[in-house]
């Protein structure tokens, strides 16, 4: 094949140009992400039950729906949250690879079976089913710069004017508004109701009857009488639109003709649909809308589309109102991708310099460098065909591939120059002769390297997604590299290399290159003597190898484990929890103190603070608060002002708050898998011991975790039980007084809850009508005495006649996991420990809890547990594939052993480097480790292959091994050094994405240094030992035939 293109160099150029063109066009269309869709698909069900407690929601809604969800295909786990404000969310998480559209249809079908069994109030509110990830993509805020609009005004504007266009934006899965739109609020006065012998039920019935839209028909409608000349629509009664119209609703007509209207017993006016949440931006009145990404959607494209949507709405904002983005996860995506691109460019430059240092021929160096853009651009084309994206993982794989892909071109150029020097052939003929000698080896080495990485592509789960990104990218680059080495590089050699006379070399005799060559030759001589010594003293060095293997196993067991390294995402969360039963006013004081510290004491680090009262990731309620903290750009912050350093300082300050628990934490590396770094676990009531026992177990867990030196910031992702007033109805007494239970329940629901009646029209938009008791009539248990129920005789009976209450405790938020009641606990490893060690400690503590209490990992911890169980199998498969490929390549079962034995020599270096830098055994480390295995095997192949050929030509095992080492040392050092320096930019990276770059770069560099430095001494020993052990026949006398010297620049 190579001969064809050597004779037709323009053909080779055309192929190279087509590959680059296809790749360039693919880059323009490839989506850009920080990560691919690592999180498994999830479908969320959201329901509201107005006025219901968390327990009521769980019993009447959650369990009904959960029971119907059983039997859905590929369902991994189901979690739910029920809140005291009547809201509920069920999240069904599916196996990786499940089509989210299919999953949503299946969930919707199951939900249709459950809907008729749900309370009528829930069905009236509607049930939302969305494909959305768990975390927020960004928060869009509205802030009143001049204070002319209140938070309620801003929230109403968002819901009325912005919510719909935002929800229609491509990529938006779900959203949450921090505030509520206006509603017509009817505030009942119990004293006036009693005066007119009316009840809340009477008011609700009258409003429902008189605030209606009537379809009144037509005059002259078809079929019409002959000769009809008129057709007109009849406009009947319409929905009310103003507070005055509602005040005029007729409630009662007395016998004397006097009338009682709604305005006589209630205050009517526009107010918030609910008052649960309020927000501020840097201390100014604000409201916001948090957007969640649809499953599988592109974060950058969605964020860009949202910004365009807001830009189109801005001209219509009220005066003094400004749109802000107080929380945005996309800047880290562009920054991290940009950083890796810079790393890629730096790697190419460093590889070029190394090649020039060893080849010492500018034309030869240019030829090898020209293969880089062809292969890289071609790889982008393959990524587009495979449906991949440009993301951190594929770009890392590109960086790793650079050192691999130039290696093939180096082998071609180096061998052509050797043939010209030794045989005196012109470049074209020398290239033909050279390709006949090496094209088999090129294909063989590519197969071996592919064999190391291909098993990664077949693993499932979120870890499998990561592995596939690396595997497909590097293997694609390797395949293209071999094709380019067989097609394009020979054509370049035949046309660009200068001819050499027999015995002539390009290597310099004077200057820097002369000094380098002389010193390198001296090193080669010393290296030969060292190898000879090792081969004459096999046993001590084999024992030393055994010690290296033992050390590798010990380090593997000692190095901490993790899923992915932590990253500075440029954002920070702070979560506020005041004592159970605290008011919103009390919580706001703590929120203000937190904001003041961040904006003043951390002004060099913090860009903005968006605070929310009434909500945090643990739950909703007046005792909950939250802050979304945007940090300044990475280039404006030093290492001392990283998100982790800020979190530590902020946490120390928040410990001084006496009236609240405040936690500062950074988001995880993969935002789709949760809201916080560290671990995520559910304690489950698997034995049916009840809520109280589960709460006791949770408190025991938290107490033991607080004493552990391995864990830090361990906290419940829920709310503590708070005071609740248990109202008991004496049914017999109520019946004796002629009061029905239905009237009692309806009166309670309307007076103390917020009862939805129907809708009204406000400035052209449909909004809701709510009836509720006025605040002064529902502040304390004594206020219950102000409310009356009418009995069958028309008499007003006070609640005190048939009801009594007592204080108790109950949870404002209840969670379930896989069908049983559960409590979620979050935490992080203490400084110096990894998430793997923290998870092991959690399992130890959970094992000491009372019987009936189990635990389950979720989110990123679930994925980490899964990835840890896959690692041994992946490692074993990769080594097995290498062995089988080598066996096929050499047609021998014994020779591959000499190559496979080199694997621990690379692993030990990767482990030492990772350990010294305080990093963990995570997914990136494993990818780097497999790459190191492949490169170590490649270096061993270069020695073993030549030693085998020399031995077959009649050399002794000893002489064949030493001669092969001498011939291959220079190219091994050159290609290894090129690869190592190409990865150096990863290890010294800073800014966005630096954590993952360090994780992969450190292990690879450590592994390659040890694989190169140790392997060049041990590989000849392995070759001789294995060949001797398996009965390789020694020649009767040592023959020294003319062997082609495969020396770079010799």
From Swiss-Prot:
Regulation: induction: The ttgABC operon is repressed by toluene; this is mediated by TtgR. The ttgABC operon is induced in response to chloramphenicol and tetracycline.
Entry's Gene Ontology cellular component terms: plasma membrane
A Pfam family hit: ACR_tran
Membrane topology note: Multi-pass membrane protein
Alphabetized UniProt keyword annotations: Antibiotic resistance, Cell inner membrane, Cell membrane, Membrane, Transmembrane, Transmembrane helix, Transport
Source lineage: Bacteria, Pseudomonadati, Pseudomonadota, Gammaproteobacteria, Pseudomonadales
Transmembrane segments: 10-30, 339-359, 370-390, 393-413, 440-460, 472-492, 539-559, 871-891, 893-913, 923-943, 972-992, 1004-1024
GO molecular function, one term: xenobiotic transmembrane transporter activity
Places the protein is found: Cell inner membrane
Superkingdom, natural source: Bacteria
Family designation: Belongs to the resistance-nodulation-cell division (RND) (TC 2.A.6) family.
Entry annotated with the keyword Cell inner membrane: yes
Protein name in the entry: Toluene efflux pump membrane transporter TtgB
Record's function text: The inner membrane transporter component of a constitutive organic solvent efflux system. Involved in export of toluene, styrene, m-xylene, propylbenzene and ethylbenzene. Also exports AMP and the antibiotics carbenicillin, nalidixic acid, chloramphenicol and tetracycline.
Primary gene name: ttgB
Organism of derivation: Pseudomonas putida (strain DOT-T1E)
GO biological process, one term: response to antibiotic
